[in-house]
Amino acid sequence: MANLHQQQIIDKIQNITFKDGTFLNEVISDIIIKGNNIGFSIDISGKNKLEAEEIRLKAINKLNNIKEVNKITIVFTQSKTIDKKAQKPKHFVENVKKIILVASGKGGVGKSTISALIAQQLSLENYRVGIVDADIYGPSIPHIFGINGIPKTVEGRIVPILAQNIQIISIGFFVKAHSAIIYRGPMASKIIYQLLSNTRWNNLDYLIIDMPPGTGDIHLSIIENYHLDGVIVVTTQQKISEIDVIRSIDLYRKLGLPILGIIENMIYMLESDHCGYLSKKYHIPLIAQIPIMPQIANACDKSLPLTNLLTLPLEKYL
C-alpha cells in the first residue's frame, strides 16, 4: 500500500472555498499523517461557524476518496484577533464615494487602457468620475487623455485636470516628458498620498486608481491606508502574465480587498486553454474578454474615447 503524503491532501481539497473567497488550503495547518490516519486544523477566525462545519464535511468527503485513508480528524482553531483600537485607522478620500483599483501583477497588460475605458464609460452613464495614475514610474494616463498641462493649486491643494469630463491626476503632469522618474519606495508612497488626499476632488461617485505593476510598496500603502471598495484584475492569455496576476490575487485576498472581477485583455482570435482559466480556478467573475484590436492602440495614441470601440458590463460588478 502506498504511503500517504501531504500533497495528496492539499490536492484533494484545493477547490474548496468559503463564501468570502478564501480557499481552504489558505487556512489549514498542522497536517499530521500517521499510517492511514490524517488530520489537520482549520483557522476559522472571522468565519461563520455553520459554514465552517459545512466546509469541514466537504473536506472529509473529498479526502475519503483517497483509498489509503482510514480515519480523518479535522479541528477548528482561531488565531488571535487584532485589537481594533490598535489598528491604524484608514483614510477616506474627501468628496469620493467609491474607490476602485485596476491592477495586475504584470506590466504591459493594458491596465491604463482599461482604467481609462472604465472611467469613460462610467462618465457616459452620468457618474462623476476621477482617475489617479498611481503608476509612479511609468505614468500613461496623461498620454491616453492627451493632457500636457500642469494642474493648478487652490489653498495648497491640487486641482485635478478635467479631460473628457473626467477628473484626472498623475505624477506625469509634474515631470518632463520622457524623463526617468526615480523614487525609493517611501517617497513613492508619499507621492501617492499627495495625489489621493491632497487633491480637490469634486464630488466623485467613482475614483479609479490605475495601479503600477507588481505587489510592492505602493500597493501596500494604498490598501493599508485607504478605504477601498474593490479591485478589478487585468490579465492576458500569456502564461507569464497569469503567473504574476496570481501573486496579485493572493495579495488582495490576504489583505481582505474584494476582487470584483477579471478582465482578459488582448485575447487572441484563436481558441486557447487559458481563456477564462484564472476566473474558473479562483472563482472570480469574468467581467470581459477584450480581443486584440489595433483600433484601441490608435484611439489611445490619438486620445480618443475608447467607448467608441467597446463597452464593459460594469453595472453587474461595481
UniProtKB/Swiss-Prot annotation:
Annotated organism of origin: Rickettsia prowazekii (strain Madrid E)
Q: Which residues bind ATP?
A: G105, K106, G107, G108, V109, G110, K111, S112
Q: Which family does it belong to?
A: Belongs to the Mrp/NBP35 ATP-binding proteins family.
Q: Which InterPro entries does this one have?
A: Mrp-like_CS, Mrp/NBP35_ATP-bd, NUBPL-like, P-loop_NTPase, YlxH/NBP35
A single GO BP: iron-sulfur cluster assembly
Know the name of this protein? Iron-sulfur cluster carrier protein
SUPFAM superfamilies linked to this entry: P-loop containing nucleoside triphosphate hydrolases (SSF52540)
Subunit: Homodimer.
Q: Which domain of life is it from?
A: Bacteria
List the PANTHER family: IRON-SULFUR PROTEIN NUBPL
Q: Which gene encodes it?
A: mrp
Q: Which UniProt keywords apply?
A: ATP-binding, Hydrolase, Iron, Iron-sulfur, Metal-binding, Nucleotide-binding
Q: Which GO terms describe its molecular function?
A: 4 iron, 4 sulfur cluster binding; ATP binding; ATP hydrolysis activity; ATP-dependent FeS chaperone activity; metal ion binding
Q: Does the keyword Iron-sulfur apply?
A: yes
* Role description: Binds and transfers iron-sulfur (Fe-S) clusters to target apoproteins. Can hydrolyze ATP.
Among CDD domains, the record links this protein to: Mrp_NBP35
